[in-house]
Curated annotation (Swiss-Prot):
Organism: Homo sapiens
CDD domains for the chain: C2_RGS-like (cd08685), PDZ_RGS3-like (cd06711), RGS_RGS3 (cd08713)
Residue span, RGS domain: 1073-1198
Main location: cytoplasm
Keyword hit for Coiled coil: no
Modified residues (Phosphoserine): S674, S943, S946, S978, S1007
Cellular component, GO, one term: nucleus
Record-level Gene Ontology MF annotations: GTPase activator activity; GTPase activity
GO biological process: G protein-coupled receptor signaling pathway; negative regulation of signal transduction; regulation of G protein-coupled receptor signaling pathway
Protein's UniProt name: Regulator of G-protein signaling 3
Subunit (UniProt): Binds EFNB1 and EFNB2. Binds the GNB1-GNG2 heterodimer.
Length: 1198
């Protein structure tokens, strides 16, 4: 088929354009008559585009109608095939689109082809990934669209950063129309704003919409009315589907990108809110905004030199100077690093991208004139009479790093909490000390006057602002990070000391690894945030990453002392971590000589620690087959084995990592082996051996002032380990937050914190006599890395929960308990790693006396757990305590409704992952407060926002070992569950035979001959050899026990057991819809139990809370309950935040201004749909549901 030439040069003007249409309409394929003069010759940039459409195989071309649209067009030349039509599209600046028959208009995009429906009527086009670079150039338009009675109400508010493709001034106006539309009578437009790239329109328009217009689109275009030409130029456009605008819940309001012609006619794109967030940092604010006290404008003329202008740029909107060549033209002209470019040759460029500005600068032949904005350091009086100097620049590494793609933790209009602040402070006191903001990654000192070294760091006094951590003194001698290289492959940036540089400086080629650890409200956090591990001396080859990483420890991760010379970084490898069966995540594994750190590199050079460290002495390695790239790391968590599945990228990497891990695991387990003479100190409670602590306190540190709060522990250096005491067979000290358990000596030993004269070198530190009964001693569950002040007496430490700021729920202090309830054998704690000599050199204060060892009381089990007390009280005491624990938990906010029973700490031990015990308060047998340990599922993984407000201790969902455990030789036993525990758990899990057999037989690996019962009756039955009688007696708890009139009323577990268990036919009906499942009481309980195992129960809890909210009648109660639901489930970083989009969150927030019963309807509908698509199908495939529908007819109760 012959092809008609599609590119002719034409003169601008309406009459010539009409003449083109006439000529082309009368010209056929075979016509060889010459074209007019204005249609021949070389084309100029002003030429038009003619779209020629011919039918395949047709001899004559179809007639063309009048011209419909003119505007700028991207240069393209491509033949597209749609159905039987061949389309040749060529453009060189302006577009002339011609229809082939009335009512059909084809605006074909070169990269979008719609197979059956034209793109005018395509209401839901196929999704296409749009990068931010494609939509950043033309500018943005702010508008709002509302619909009332089939009338569209448009409010064109303002524009921003409008950039026209034509040179000269920009005179913008906005044009609105419905497409496709033949009549021009319905086109509306705003007034023209002369010479303004940020125009303010504030005009309203009304568009009545008929039923036949539902398939059309509302087109909003922004034009530039050029003064030197009659033809306007298109700046950008966007379009909205009319049918979607008429829906009641559709809301169009805010900033939208101006897209290109092809893209804008089919879709619209809203500017993300994170890109509109007001920038708090003075450096990141839009320059030139009248903030003259923080900066100034400078006009700099830079001539082109031999090698260019002599500077590099970075960042987008605005562009900043990244580096200035020493001695180059830019430096001689006065340009400095981090200057913000406002204008280039008197042309505004603050909204330009870096690539565009670089291309424009390169095209300048002789010189450039820059208008730049330069930050002026702001000096303010700081705490303690020092000088507070806000950082006037980012580090070079920050500028090279790309911006965050997703900022989930941004708070809009809400003051951030101290642990969420992103402030960056440099505080210099009289001793030239440095303090660093709590969450800032790191701050580097800019190059000033040839200074390449850091000022001398010293121990500064704690500021009043809690959002500070103090940099510990640095020893620049032997703690430099030197990656492992082979002798012949040492790169230039390796930082070799042989070059004679001072490596305390922050030059371009020497970056230090720094560890930022959060404050959580403590002003004297002394745990050395600048980490410089010493050089490794391993033989595992070249596999330490070349660039140092910034390790960030979140609030839920146990901080580490990586400065310890006994700890060596062996390797750093990028591996795949399998979180589920098919879900894998890219992680960076840091293997030290004694532990493993799993991190995720969200940004280049920045690694967020995902979980608490795994100590090598408590892990095992399974390499698997040699052909498979996967290998497993097993670890102990509450006497159950858990594992991580890792996958290497190559066989060499797997062999390297496995070799390193297996060798060092063997070393650490050999070092952690208990000495033979320590066996004499082991008790019968060997199955409850406490976790050993790596992070202790070393001797020789001075006392903390009485006004300071607790400081976290640091790593115990070699040579300062205390001798093993009788409760720590492995020679390790217990964690301050891990209260070890014991069940043997509960009736014979008591204890309280020792006096200051307790010597730290004893195996068993002496304990004072217990205080009087009316005095209280704190028994608080502290987070990891914190401890009470050792030098305070009980009266002072009694007020510790009131002054401590921590996300952990502060428990009230417990009273002095009788020996049958609590016993407190002493635990010696090591002291700070810094010697008094270092403190003397740092602060200038005289050395203080060595701090006496602080004895941490060991939390024993109360009468509910004690074997002897259990023998005296029996089953009734267990049930009474269980019901009291439920009543306490029901009254607490933020707690889950159903917790595991506290009367049995050995319930349900399996080989899958379990979570650590928590300490809770409850009523003791004699009315006093007591401590009880429950093994409930407390940790959450649904969002990172919830981890910051978790009411429990600092923990992570995948974390099951807060500290290193004792060794592998710990004997483990399985005990028969108590009746109340059995009833509660069987009622929760549906009473399947699998759970029933698991309760009475236990795990094969855990069961043994010396199982410990709950009471004397259970012990007697266990000794008997008649298994049938044993089972009959145990199953007797399912009878209605009306024979005990003095027994307490039945709790929630009894009510659940009395509920009707559905048949398999009823359970099958649950698979028809989620509504039928939630209506059934038993189905709701089973579904909630399933979601708890999936760590997504917050969705159902939110849905149930909304259902309860609709039943509230009082308006005052409704308002308070609505705020509580929003703060707990919907607010950003809520403790149980559900997965909602930003529109639903903002819509619900607006509804709270006037609270009604339906203010949560949209959010509840979204969560219901999420459960219906995600959780509900998984529940139908779960073993729990399959057991219910496949259950056999059970025998009647005995």
């Amino acid at each position: 088929m012959p092809v008609i030439p599609a590119l002719w040069e034409v003169e601008m003007g309406r009459s010539q354009g009409q003449e083109i249409e006439t000529i082309l309409a009368n010209r056929s394929h075979s016509d060889s008559t010459p074209l007019p003069n204005f249609l021949s010759g070389s084309h100029r940039p002003e030429c038009c585009t003619c779209r020629l459409l011919t039918a395949s195989g047709a001899q004559d071309s179809l007639p063309f109608g009048r011209r419909l649209y003119s505007g700028p067009w991207r240069s393209c030349e491509e033949v597209c095939h749609v159905s039987v039509l061949s389309v040749l599209s060529t453009s060189c600046g302006l577009s002339l689109s011609l229809p082939i028959f009335p009512g059909w208009m084809e605006w074909l995009s070169p990269d979008i082809a719609l197979p059956r429906r034209d793109e005018w009527t395509q209401t839901s086009p196929a999704r296409k990934r749009i990068t931010h670079a494609k939509v950043q150039g033309a500018g943005q338009l702010r508008l709002s669209i509302d619909a009332q009675d089939r009338v569209l109400l448009l409010h064109i508010i303002e524009g921003k950063g409008l950039i026209s493709k034509q040179p000269g001034t920009c005179d913008p106006y906005v044009k609105i129309s419905l497409i496709p539309e033949d009549s021009r009578l319905r086109h509306q437009k705003t007034q023209t704003v002369p010479d303004c790239r940020d125009p303010a329109f504030h005009e309203h328009f009304f568009f009545p919409v008929q039923e036949e217009d539902d398939q059309k689109r509302l087109l909003v275009t922004v034009w530039n009315r050029a003064s030197q030409s009659r033809q306007s130029g298109l700046i950008g456009c966007m379009s909205f589907g009319v049918k979607s605008l008429l829906t009641p819940d559709k809301e169009i309001s805010g900033w939208y990108y101006l897209l290109g012609e092809h893209l804008g006619r089919t879709k619209h794109l809203k500017v993300a809110r994170r890109r509109l967030r007001p920038l708090r940092d003075p450096l990141l604010r839009m320059p030139g905004g009248g903030d003259t006290e923080n900066g100034k404008k400078l006009k700099i003329t830079i001539p082109r030199g031999k090698d260019g202008f002599g500077f590099t740029i970075c960042c987008d909107s605005p562009v900043r100077v990244q580096a200035v060549d020493s001695g180059g033209p830019a430096e001689r002209a006065g340009l400095q690093q981090l200057d913000t470019v406002l204008q280039l040759n008197e042309r505004p460029v603050e909204h330009w991208k870096c690539v565009e500005l670089a291309h424009e600068i390169r095209s300048c032949p002789s010189e450039i004139i820059l208008l730049v904005w330069r930050m002026v350091p702001q000096v303010k009086p700081g705490p303690d009479g020092g000088v507070l100097r806000r950082a006037s620049c980012k580090s070079t590494h920050d500028l090279q790093s790309p911006p965050n793609k997703r900022e989930k933790n941004c708070t809009h209009g809400v003051q951030a909490r101290p642990e969420q602040r992103h402030s960056c402070h440099l505080v210099c006191d009289s001793s030239d000390g440095l303090l660093l903001g709590g969450w800032e990654r790191y701050t580097e000192v800019a190059k000033r006057g040839g200074q390449h070294t850091l000022p001398a760091l010293s121990r500064a006094t704690a500021p009043t602002d809690p959002n500070y951590i103090i940099l510990a003194p640095l020893n620049p001698g032997s703690q430099l990070l030197r990656p492992v290289y082979q002798e012949d492959t040492i790169p230039e940036e390796s930082g070799s000391p042989s070059k004679g540089k001072s490596y305390t400086g922050l030059g371009k080629k020497s970056r230090l690894m720094k560890t930022v650890q959060t404050m959580k409200g403590h002003g004297n956090y002394q745990n050395c945030p600048v980490v410089r591990p010493h050089a490794t001396h391993s033989s595992y080859g070249t596999y330490v990453t070349l660039a140092p990483k910034v390790l960030v420890f979140p609030v839920f991760v146990q901080p580490l002392d990586l400065c310890n010379p006994a700890r060596t970084l062996l390797l750093s490898e990028e591996l795949l971590l399998y979180e589920g069966r098919n879900k894998a995540a890219e992680v960076t594994l840091f293997a030290y000589s004694d532990l493993l750190l799993f991190t995720k590199e969200d940004e280049p050079g920045r690694c967020d620690v995902l979980r608490n460290p795994l100590y090598l002495q408590s892990v095992k390695l399974q390499e698997g087959s040699s052909e498979d790239l996967k290998f497993c790391v097993l670890y102990l968590a509450e006497k159950a084995e858990c594992l991580f599945t890792l996958e290497a990228h190559s066989q060499e990497q797997k062999k390297r990592v496995c070799w390193c891990l297996s060798e060092n695991i063997a070393k650490q387990q050999q070092l952690a082996a208990s000495p033979p003479d320590s066996k004499m100190f082991e008790t019968e409670a060997d199955e409850k051996r406490e976790m050993a602590l790596e992070e202790g306190k070393g001797p020789g540190a001075e006392d903390s002032p009485p006004s300071k709060e607790p400081s976290p522990g640091q790593e115990l250096p070699p040579g300062q380990d205390l001798p093993p005491n009788k409760d720590s067979p492995s020679g390790q000290e217990p964690a301050p937050s891990q209260e070890p358990l014991s069940s043997k000596d509960s009736a014979t030993s008591e204890g309280s914190p020792p006096g200051p004269d307790a010597p730290p070198s004893k195996d068993v530190p002496p304990c004072q006599e217990p205080p009087p009964a009316q005095d209280l001693s704190p028994c608080q569950d502290l987070p990891a890395g914190q401890e009470p002040l050792p030098h305070q007496d009980p009266l002072l430490t009694k007020d510790l929960p009131a002054i401590q700021e921590s996300p952990t729920r502060d428990l009230p202090p417990c009273q002095d308990l009788p020996p049958s309830q609590v016993s407190l054998p002493a635990k010696a704690l090591t002291e700070d790693t810094m010697s008094s000599g270092d403190l003397l050199a740092a602060t200038g204060d005289p050395p203080a006396a060595p701090r006496p060892a602080f004895v941490i009381p060991e939390v024993r089990l109360d009468s509910t757990y004690s074997q002897k007390a259990g023998a005296e009280q029996g089953c009734s005491g267990d049930e009474e305590d269980a019901e009291e624990a439920e009543e306490v938990e029901e009254g607490e906010e933020g707690e889950e409704d159903e917790d595991e029973d506290t009367s049995d700490d050995n319930y349900g031990e399996r080989s899958e992952a379990k979570r650590s015990s928590m300490i809770e308060t409850g009523q003791g047998a004699e009315g006093g407060l007591s401590l009880r340990v429950q093994n409930s599922l407390r940790r959450r993984t649904h969002s990172e926002g919830s981890l910051l407000q978790e009411p429990r201790g600092p923990c992570f969902a995948s974390d099951t070992t807060l500290h290193c455990s004792d060794g592998e030789g710990a004997a483990s036993t399985w005990g028969m569950p108590s009746p109340s525990t059995l009833k509660k758990e069987l009622g929760r899990n549906g009473g399947s035979m699998h759970h029933l057999s698991l309760f009475f037989t236990g795990h094969r690996k855990m069961s043994g001959a010396d199982t410990v019962g709950d009471d004397d009756e259970a012990s007697r039955k266990r000794k008997s050899k008649n298994l049938a009688k044993d089972m009959k007696n145990k199953l007797g708890i399912f009878r209605r026990r009306n024979e005990s009139p003095g027994a307490p009323p039945a709790g929630k577990a009894d009510k659940m057991m009395k509920s009707f268990k559905p048949t398999s036919e009823e359970a099958l009906k649950w698979g028809e819809s989620l509504e039928k499942l939630l209506v059934h009481k038993y189905g709701l309980a089973v579904f909630q139990a399933f979601l708890r195992t999936e760590f997504s129960e917050e969705n159902l809890e939110f849905w149930l809370a909304c259902e309860d909210f609709k039943k509230v009648k009082s308006q005052s109660k409704m308002a308070s309950k609505a705020k509580k639901i929003f703060a707990e489930y919907i607010a950003i970083q809520a403790c149980k935040e559900v997965n909602l989009d930003s529109y639903t969150r903002e819509h619900t927030k607006d509804n709270l201004q006037s609270v009604t019963r339906g203010c949560f309807d949209l959010a509840q509908k979204r969560i219901f749909g999420l459960m219906e698509k995600d959780s509900y199908p998984r529940f139908l495939r779960s073993d729990l549901y399959l057991d219910l529908i496949n259950q056999k007819k059970m025998s009647p109760p005995l």
